[in-house]
A protein has these predicted regions:
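Solvent-exposed alpha-helix faces
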Residues: 46-50, 107, 116, 193, ...
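Conserved pre-ATP/AMP-binding loop-to-beta segment of ANL
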Residues: 18-21, 136, 152, 162-187, ...
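Conserved AMP-binding/adenylate-forming core of the ANL superfamily
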Residues: 23-78, 95-100, 153-158, 162, ...
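Helix N-cap/beta->alpha junction signal
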Residues: 67-69, 115, 139, 181
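Structural core segment of the AMP-binding/adenylate-forming
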Residues: 82-160
Length: 211
């Protein structure tokens, strides 16, 4: 099957593989590997996509992800892609100054943060990022700063998409999606100067499957 955009990939795989395992993640509290099926993956991505619409995310908007590797990262990626959004990953060890530079350069409104370090770093520079409106926290164990009145947890974000209230908007955006849409901006480490944003389109990921 030929794909023109990453937004459709998870759902087509779910149609094909259903309840087969798509990925596993490690629960460090129980030391168990937790499976996620293709159907679960697809359903969660659809819910995340609807939550993005509820949040007010626009097509081609830049969404930041400042986190360790987590399954939530996939849901944000593919949920954003369904809205023709662009995701921008941060190094999990980025300093507050590095995060501030990327947020301001990419004009990020919504930043997903993983654990306590990422949250603390992002909150410390919130007031220096004119575009930044909200942090969305993956890990429920993260303790929010008492002064923080805008951040929400990931489960609260996902609740905004429960029941797929904006699915018609999502489907319209996905229908407009193009092979040449921007998928990610990857910032370099900045060891020889300010980080540079490398622009990767959906075609960069999909072309290897076509050859």
């Amino acid at each position: 099957m030929t794909y023109h955009h990453l937004s459709v990939l998870v759902h087509r795989q779910a149609e094909k593989y259903g309840d087969r395992v798509a990925l596993r993640y490690r629960d460090y509290e129980t030391a168990q590997w937790i499976p996620i099926t293709w159907n679960q993956f697809s359903g969660t991505v659809r819910q995340a996509a609807n939550a993005f619409v509820a949040l007010g995310v626009e097509e081609q908007e830049n969404i930041g992800i400042f986190s360790q590797n987590k399954p939530e990262w996939f849901y944000v990626d593919f949920g954003a892609f369904a809205n023709r959004g662009v995701t921008i990953p941060f190094y999990a060890t980025s300093s507050p100054a590095q995060a501030q530079y990327i947020i301001n350069d990419a004009q990020i409104r919504y930043l997903f943060v993983g654990e306590q370090y990422q949250y603390d770093s992002a909150f410390s520079i919130f007031g220096f990022c004119s575009s930044l409106q909200q942090l969305i926290i993956f890990d429920r164990s993260v303790v929010k700063d008492p002064r923080d009145v805008s951040s929400i947890y990931f489960d609260e974000f996902m609740a905004m998409g429960e029941g797929l209230p904006h699915n018609e908007v999502v489907e319209e955006r996905t229908a407009r999606a193009s092979y040449d849409d921007l998928a990610n901006i990857l910032y370099t480490s900045g060891t020889t100067g300010e980080p540079k944003g490398v622009m990767l389109h959906h075609s960069c990921y999909l072309e290897p499957f076509h050859t």
